C-alpha cells in the first residue's frame, strides 16, 4: 500500500467572492465553492483512492469542502478531525476588510509585504512563518504517523496553512514558497517513501 496524502484548499468562500481578507473569520462556501468541492471528490473517486482518515481546520469553509469530497467518495462516515492548527493564517486587523480598500489605505507595497513576506505579519496577525509554526508540528505529531502506517490521508484546509505545509514537505525556501499560488478546490496528491521523503506529486486538474 502506498503512503498517500491529499491536500486541498477549500472551495471558493463567500468572502473570496467579495474580495475580503478572511483569515480566521468563518464565512461559508459559495455555490461555486460547493461545486468545486464536489468536482474534486468525483475526480478523487476516479483515481481509486480511499481515505483512512481526514483532517480539516476549525473553519466551516474547509469542513464543508472535506464533507462534500467524502460524500462523493461514498465515505461520509469517515472520521473527520477538526483542528485550529490547520486554520488559515490570521490576518489580524485586516480580517474582514476589502482588499482594494486596504491597498488604498496602506499602499500597494505595504499590503504586498503583508501578504507575501514570509516573516512580516499584518497588525495583530500572523506571518506565513507563524502559520507554519503551528501547522508543521501538528502534522508531524498527528498526521504523519498515519502516512507512515501506509494509510491515505485527506487534509482540507486553506491557502496559507497548506503553503506552510508544502514548504516543509518539499523543503522549499521562503522565496520559493511565497511565489506559490494554490487554486481553490484542486487536489494535490503526494505519495511517500518509507523514510518520509516524497515519492511522487500529482495535481488533479478538473
UniProtKB/Swiss-Prot annotation:
Keyword hit for Isomerase: yes
Q: Which reaction does it catalyse?
A: (2R)-2-phosphoglycerate = (2R)-3-phosphoglycerate
Give this protein's Gene Ontology molecular function annotations.
phosphoglycerate mutase activity
> EC top class, in one word?
isomerase
List of residues binding substrate: 9-16, 22-23, 61, 88-91, 99, 115-116, 159-160
Where does the record locate the signal sequence feature? none
Sites annotated Transition state stabilizer: 158
Keywords associated with the record: Gluconeogenesis, Glycolysis, Isomerase
Residue positions of the active site: 10 (tele-phosphohistidine intermediate), 88 (proton donor/acceptor)
Top-level taxonomic group:
Bacteria
Record bears the keyword Nucleotidyltransferase? no
SUPFAM superfamilies, from UniProt?
Answer: Phosphoglycerate mutase-like
Subunit-level organization: Homodimer.
Homology family: Belongs to the phosphoglycerate mutase family. BPG-dependent PGAM subfamily.
Protein name per the record: 2,3-bisphosphoglycerate-dependent phosphoglycerate mutase
Organism listed in the record:
Bartonella henselae (strain ATCC 49882 / DSM 28221 / CCUG 30454 / Houston 1) (Rochalimaea henselae)
Lineage of producing organism: Bacteria, Pseudomonadati, Pseudomonadota, Alphaproteobacteria, Hyphomicrobiales
Amino acid at each position: 500500500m502506498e503512503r498517500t496524502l491529499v491536500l486541498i484548499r477549500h472551495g471558493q468562500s463567500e468572502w473570496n467572492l467579495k474580495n475580503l481578507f478572511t483569515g480566521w473569520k468563518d464565512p461559508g462556501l459559495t455555490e461555486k465553492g460547493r461545486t468545486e468541492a464536489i468536482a474534486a471528490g468525483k475526480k478523487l473517486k476516479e483515481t481509486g483512492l480511499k481515505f483512512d482518515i481526514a483532517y480539516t481546520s476549525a473553519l466551516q469553509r474547509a469542513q464543508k469542502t472535506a464533507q462534500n469530497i467524502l460524500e462523493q467518495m461514498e465515505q461520509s462516515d469517515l472520521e473527520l478531525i477538526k483542528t485550529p492548527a490547520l486554520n488559515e493564517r490570521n490576518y489580524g486587523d485586516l480580517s474582514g476588510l476589502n482588499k482594494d480598500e486596504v491597498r488604498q489605505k496602506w499602499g500597494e507595497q505595504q499590503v504586498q509585504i503583508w501578504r507575501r513576506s514570509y516573516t512580516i505579519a499584518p497588525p495583530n496577525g500572523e506571518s506565513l512563518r507563524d502559520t507554519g509554526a503551528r501547522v508543521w508540528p501538528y502534522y508531524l505529531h498527528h498526521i504523519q504517523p498515519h502516512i507512515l502506517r501506509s494509510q491515505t490521508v485527506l487534509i482540507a484546509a486553506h491557502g496559507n496553512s497548506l503553503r506552510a505545509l508544502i514548504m516543509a514537505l518539499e523543503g522549499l525556501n521562503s522565496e520559493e514558497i511565497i511565489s506559490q499560488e494554490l487554486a481553490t478546490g484542486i487536489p494535490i496528491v503526494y505519495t511517500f517513501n518509507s523514510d518520509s521523503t516524497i515519492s511522487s506529486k500529482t495535481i488533479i486538474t478538473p
